[in-house]
C-alpha cells in the first residue's frame, strides 16, 4: 500500500521535470512567505526521490525486453481488490487508479524478468489444471448463532428474497448493504469451510447454515466461471505456476543483473547511489 502512495505523491515531482535549479516560480502563497517550484521539487526529491528514480529506471529498462498487457494488469487489480477489500477502495481514493496500475505494471515487469529463468514441465501444468477451480460469485448472510441461521434458512425455503434478508439480518458490514454480495473469488480467498460449501453449490442454490470462526453463513452462489480447455489456459497456467515459484531474492537478483547490463548512468549527484 505504501508503494502506491509513494508513486502518487512523487508524480508531482516528475511533473516538474522542466524545473531546473534556480526556478523561483511560486506555486503556493501565504502571508508568511511563498513556496517555489524549486523548493517543492527539492523537498519531494529528498523524501522519496531515490525510490522513484529506482522504479523509473527499472520500468525503462525492463519495458524494452518484457511486455505487460492491460489484461494482465486488470487481473492483478482484481486480485488486489479481493485481497484488500475496502482498503483497496481507500487507496484508490487517495492516490488514483493510474498510480496503482503503474505500480502493478512495474511489479509484473520485475516478475516476468525473474520468470525467464524458471522452468516448468508439462506435467506440472496439467496437474495444476486438474486441480484448478474457476472463480465463483456468491452472496451470504452471516449471523452469530445457529438458531437464527436456521430461521433465516426457513424463510428462504419459503421463497423470501435473499438480498432483502441479507440486508435485514446479516452481521457482515462489508456485504450486508449490498444484499450479501461478496463479488467474485477463487480458491484460497475464503476460509476453508466457507469455500468448500460454496464450491459444492450450483448457480442459484442456497446452502444450509455453514459454521466458521466468524459465525454461521447461509451461502448463495449467483454465478460461476466456466473451466476452459487446457490448451486455452496453458499460457495463463504457465504464468501462475512460474509466479508461485518466485521469491523476492530471485526477482531482485535478476533485475539487478539487467540494470547492470543496461549501463545506467545517473547524472544527479544526490541520487547516484540509488542502484548500489
From Swiss-Prot:
Any one Gene Ontology BP term: protein folding
GO CC annotation, single: plasma membrane
Domain of life: Bacteria
Spans traversing the lipid bilayer: none
Lipid-binding residues (covalent, S-diacylglycerol cysteine): 19
Compartments it resides in: Cell membrane
Signal peptide: 1-18
Enzyme class: isomerase
Lipid-modified sites (N-palmitoyl cysteine): 19
Domain PpiC per the UniProt entry, residue ranges: 133-223
Coiled coil ranges: none
EC number: 5.2.1.8
SUPFAM superfamilies: FKBP-like (SSF54534), Triger factor/SurA peptide-binding domain-like (SSF109998)
Family, similarity comment: Belongs to the PrsA family.
Function: Plays a major role in protein secretion by helping the post-translocational extracellular folding of several secreted proteins.
Stated name of the protein: Foldase protein PrsA
Organism: Geobacillus sp. (strain WCH70)
Gene: prsA
Amino acid at each position: 500500500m505504501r508503494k502506491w502512495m509513494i508513486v502518487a505523491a512523487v508524480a508531482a515531482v516528475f511533473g516538474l521535470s522542466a524545473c531546473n535549479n534556480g526556478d523561483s516560480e511560486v506555486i503556493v502563497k501565504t502571508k508568511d512567505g511563498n513556496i517555489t517550484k524549486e523548493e517543492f521539487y527539492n523537498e519531494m526529491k529528498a523524501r522519496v526521490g531515490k525510490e522513484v528514480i529506482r522504479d523509473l529506471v527499472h520500468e525503462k529498462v525492463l519495458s524494452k525486453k518484457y511486455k505487460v498487457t492491460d489484461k494482465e494488469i486488470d487481473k492483478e487489480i482484481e486480485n488486489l481488490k479481493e485481497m484488500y477489500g475496502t482498503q483497496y477502495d481507500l487507496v484508490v481514493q487517495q492516490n488514483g487508479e493510474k498510480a496503482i496500475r503503474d505500480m502493478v505494471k512495474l511489479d509484473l515487469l520485475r516478475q516476468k524478468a525473474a520468470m525467464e529463468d524458471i522452468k516448468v514441465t508439462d506435467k506440472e501444468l496439467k496437474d495444476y489444471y486438474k486441480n484448478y477451480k474457476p472463480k465463483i460469485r456468491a452472496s451470504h448472510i452471516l449471523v452469530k448463532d445457529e438458531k437464527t441461521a436456521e430461521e433465516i434458512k426457513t424463510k428462504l425455503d419459503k421463497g423470501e428474497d435473499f438480498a432483502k434478508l441479507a440486508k435485514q439480518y446479516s452481521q457482515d458490514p462489508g456485504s450486508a448493504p449490498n444484499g450479501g454480495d461478496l463479488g467474485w473469488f477463487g480458491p484460497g480467498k475464503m476460509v476453508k469451510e466457507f469455500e468448500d460449501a460454496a464450491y459444492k453449490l450450483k448457480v442459484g442454490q442456497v446452502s444450509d447454515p455453514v459454521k466458521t470462526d466468524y459465525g454461521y453463513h447461509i451461502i448463495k452462489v449467483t454465478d460461476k466461471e466456466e473451466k476452459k480447455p487446457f490448451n486455452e489456459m496453458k499460457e495463463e497456467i504457465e504464468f501462475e505456476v512460474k509466479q508461485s515459484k518466485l521469491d523476492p531474492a530471485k526477482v531482485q537478483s535478476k533485475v539487478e543483473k539487467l540494470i547492470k547490463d543496461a549501463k545506467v548512468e545517473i547524472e544527479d549527484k544526490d541520487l547516484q547511489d540509488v542502484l548500489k
